[in-house]
């Protein structure tokens, strides 16, 4: 297990690697909440979550960029800029081409990575992904509300709202965000989270018009009860990509990795197909 930092223009990206089997290497990207705190210090949690993937392949978990200047967060946290930083990081690690397993905001970053650096990507696993955030959508409205609360430092209210919106519409709350709401923590690097949310609302981050260029096999998973990224948004991504398969869970909300029935089994089978 190794944790290293990689310099990129205006900041750095931390990576955590688990070495193992000889299949196509896997790169893992989380959602926008990844920006709450640096990757360092979470290694044991990451190892427990991803050690199952290492039976067949090396796994590298990538953090969001850490800007040298916090005031530069919105620029460096733009999904396309992050994708360029990830490309530089993978080349520095000597890893690639790779499979990508990404969730939510990490999915849009992965789409840009595949469009701009196609030589680095062999397969995509995208959970709760959207390629755009229409300004008049409920998704955009909720993100703007998150930004307002975060900038005001109202973290208790913020996490309580997240606990409700991350759950499936039929659940009481999302466990992880519910616990955070009760603890009312202040994230270590809120500027990264806020910066990525603002960039995600910027039309320059929308990648819908480029989806037809992505020819690699893609497994796209969505919860039909997702209150953050509606199923229609994820369906749009699957429809525009020529080699994408959409699989849905009727009872799952936004937390696809932890709540989608059979998630790991589906992903492992899809990744194994690329090892042949």
Question: Where does each model-flagged region fall?
Answer:
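Catalytic active-site module of serine/aspartate enzymes centered on a nucleophile-bearing elbow/loop
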Residues: 243-276
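Conserved HGGG/HGGXW glycine-rich cap/lid loop of the alpha/beta-hydrolase fold
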Residues: 7-71
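Conserved alpha/beta-hydrolase "acid-adjacent" motif
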Residues: 227-233
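Gly/Ala-rich beta-loop-alpha elbow adjacent to hydrolase catalytic centers
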Residues: 102-106, 110
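Conserved acidic catalytic loop of the alpha/beta-hydrolase fold
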Residues: 81-98
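Conserved alpha/beta-hydrolase catalytic His-Asp/Glu region
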Residues: 135-138, 155-204, 210
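Flexible "cap/lid" loop of the alpha/beta hydrolase fold
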Residues: 111, 115, 123-151
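Short beta-strand/loop motif that positions the catalytic acidic residue
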Residues: 214, 220-222, 226
